[in-house]
Regions:
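Acidic/histidine-rich catalytic neighborhood
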Residues: 252-275
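Extended assembly-interface regions of large multimeric machines
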Residues: 1-127
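Short linear, low-complexity motifs centered on an aromatic residue
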Residues: 108-126, 245-249, 413-427
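Sequence/fold signature of self-assembling virion shell proteins
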Residues: 68, 77, 83-85, 159-161, ...
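Short, intrinsically disordered N-terminal pre-domain segments
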Residues: 1-19, 246-247, 261, 319-321, ...
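Extracellular/periplasmic catalytic domains that process cell-envelope and extracellular macromolecules
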Residues: 92-95, 193-195, 295-297
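Short, glycine/acidic-rich hinge or "gate" loops at secondary-structure transitions
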Residues: 219-220, 235-258
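Acidic/polar, low-complexity extended loops/arms that serve as protein-protein interfaces
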Residues: 63, 74-81, 97, 101-238
Length: 445
């Protein structure tokens, strides 16, 4: 991505083509320019591989004629990936790539992770052996909920660590039993590897002639559009379904009657529909807060949901007595998956392919930061479209084929909040990505 400005300048006529939708997002524009550069490089390599002429003439007539179509397909397809909205997009410049994660740790490179959960107020107030004189009742930090102090302030369920005395500090390092407490860091790596998808189509010259004569359509162009649209749709659904599969179960026990299920009849405590829908909104906020607590990156800010749940979220504002709570959500299964912004913060996306029945409502709340590196899942395109045109050796009828290469990679911190879990390679494990929380919604009406 370091050369994206150079790529954008080179591909400016394509990026700003008047017949194509404008790319308003600067990062989408940068990624598209890198992918266009990858596409051109791949096409040149294919030309050289397939040429049967002298080495000085690296041109393949069956491939070079298709470069403009490929460039056009890439330009139209790449900005429309849903991964830009619900995940991060990091283009690859080679078939494999490495993601590095640095973790701060207590004591040694294999110690517990620091700077993730609450800082240990006791760690720097004692020596490496764990002893210090501080004049207070405790030298160890314990507990996570200060509300227990109201029940029994002296019970010791919530304690703090404090600084050591001057005498103890002066004695640090004077012998092996009085060493400084120590910290370290570890560098861990994850590997993302490009995988492939491939489709082909065949047609006859007679079909191409008749289609052109009767409908004015080019058979090769239409089939190329069909194949590329199918590949794009499959990638979109893979990203969405991977997030569904890998998201943690939301609505934990204690928040709701049944863990993972928000029942509007038993959990919202509302008297009528809008009050129940507001209970649903509050539960969604709790899942968003849980993402912040689990990742220490930020509250959840994106929602993927079924159409009826989105409509319920809309009604919670539209049907309320306060017009200021109008959420301006546009719910349409047949149109754009982006429905609108909820409460000025959540971007709501409708999944038009999810089962929209009384027993199958759900929502997934996730977090995606302003930086492309701040997400729970990354889509890593390498070569978006490779097109090959051939002729059947027996029938002499034309054939075309498409291939694409990309990787899916989970955030290295998505499953390793304490730093002790194994390094993640690939999209990660089911029910383990803490950047996303998945909840079933029952008794919506």
């Amino acid at each position: 991505m370091y050369l994206s400005e150079t790529h954008e300048k080179k591909w400016q006529p394509v990026l700003e083509h008047p017949d194509l939708p404008k790319i308003g997002d600067s990062y989408k524009r940068a990624v598209t320019s890198v992918i266009l550069e990858n596409q051109e490089r791949a096409a040149k390599e294919d030309n050289a591989f397939l040429s049967e002429a002298a080495p000085t003439n690296a041109t393949g007539s069956n491939i070079s004629n298709w470069d403009p179509i490929l460039i056009s397909l890439v330009r139209r397809a790449m900005p429309n990936l849903i991964a830009y909205d619900i995940a991060g997009v990091q283009p690859m410049t080679g078939p494999t790539g490495l993601i590095f994660a640095m973790r701060s740790r207590y004591t040694s490179q294999t110690g517990g992770e620091a700077m993730f959960d609450e800082a240990d107020t006791d760690f720097s107030g004692r020596n490496a052996a764990g002893s210090a004189v501080d004049g207070y009742s405790t030298t160890a930090q314990g507990g996570t909920n200060p509300s227990v102090l109201n029940d029994s302030p002296s019970a010791g369920a919530y304690t703090k660590g404090t600084a050591m005395t001057t005498a103890a500090a002066e004695a640090l390092g004077d012998d092996s039993g009085n060493a400084f407490a120590e910290m370290a860091f570890s560098i861990e790596k994850s590997t993302v590897t490009a995988k492939s998808r491939a489709l082909k189509a065949e047609y006859t010259m007679e079909l191409a002639q008749d289609l052109k004569a009767i409908h004015g359509l080019d058979a090769e162009t239409e089939l190329a559009n069909i194949l590329s649209a199918e590949i794009l749709a499959e990638i979109n659904r893979e990203v969405v379904r991977t997030i569904y599969t890998n998201a943690e179960k939301g609505s934990p026990a204690g928040h709701v009657t049944t863990a993972g299920i928000f029942d509007l009849d038993t959990d919202s405590n509302g008297r009528w529909s809008v009050e129940r829908f507001k209970g649903l909104m509050f539960n969604l906020e709790r899942d968003a807060n849980r993402i912040a607590q689990r990742t220490r990156r930020g509250k959840g800010n994106i929602i993927i949901t079924s159409a009826d749940v989105a409509s319920a979220l809309q009604m919670a504002g539209v049907l309320d007595y306060t017009p200021a709570l109008n959420n301006n959500l546009t719910v349409d299964d047949t149109g754009n998956t982006f429905a609108g912004v909820l409460n000025g913060r959540f971007k709501v996306y409708i999944d038009p392919y999810s089962a929209n029945s009384a027993s199958a409502h759900y929502y997934v709340v996730g977090y995606k930061g302003t930086s492309p590196y701040d997400a729970g899942m990354f889509y890593c395109p390498y070569v978006p479209l490779q097109m090959v045109r051939a002729v059947g050796q027996d029938t002499f009828q034309p054939k075309i084929g498409f291939k694409t290469r990309y990787g899916l990679q989970a955030n290295p911190f998505a499953e390793a909040g304490t730093g002790d879990a194994a390094v993640i390679n690939g999209a990660g494990s089911a029910n383990a990505n803490r950047y996303y929380q998945r909840t079933q919604v029952a008794n919506l009406m």
